[in-house]
Structures are given as structure tokens and as C-alpha cells.
Amino acid sequence: MTEDMSEDGFYPKHDFQRPHLSDAPICWPVLSATERHDAAEDLKDWVRWLVYRYGLDPRTVTPCWTMHGELVEEISALRTGWISCYTWPLDGSALLAWHASFAEARVRLSEWISRNGCRPGEHRG
């Protein structure tokens, strides 16, 4: 793998910025308006990467996911778990466990989106 993945044909050039990636879990109710805004922007960057990296479609992460508290909480938990896989002390099997949790989370995300009835370009919240 090359150091700059954008130069590798397998990794197409992406248009997202690297998230700040604070390793603390996001507890939305206790954040100030500024902290909530910053955390939301960071989470949006991570979700853009997640959607790109795993080829997720709108049935899993709808474009209006930020307007659904249950999706924000689930995605926040996924991000926190993912970050913890890369913090010390490292656990070699942590990413495998995260992927198992991610598989379960995709089912829940899809079910919530299905119940909400949202589609690309159409929010029904």
C-alpha cells in the first residue's frame, strides 16, 4: 500500500476531511451549543468516511441521519468503539469485534430508516 492512498487506483480520491477524532464518547445532552456543533461536524466527517469506506447506501445511512436522534446515538457509539480500537492499550482482536458490532448496528440502522420512511432527498422525520 502506498503512503498516499489517493495515488493508488484501488483507493479513489476522496472529498472528506480527516475527523478530529476525540476518543471520548459523545454525551450529547451535556454538551454546550458550541461543543454540540463541533462534535456534530466531527461525526459528519467520520460518517462520510464510513459511508465511503464500507460502500454504505442510503438504506443504512440516510442523508438525513443527523435529523434522527436514534441514528445519531447509534453512529456515535460506532465511532467511539472504532476509535477505541486504535487507542492504547491496543487489542489485536478489537477491530474484529468492532466489525461484528458494526454488522449488528447496520441492521438496526436499516430498521430505523425503514420505519422512518426516509429516502434520498425525502426526509420523513
Where are these regions (language model features)?
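Short, solvent-exposed segments of well-ordered alpha helices
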Residues: V30, T34-E41, T62-V72, L96
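Soluble extracellular-acting proteins and domains
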Residues: E35-R36, Y54, T66, I83-T87, ...
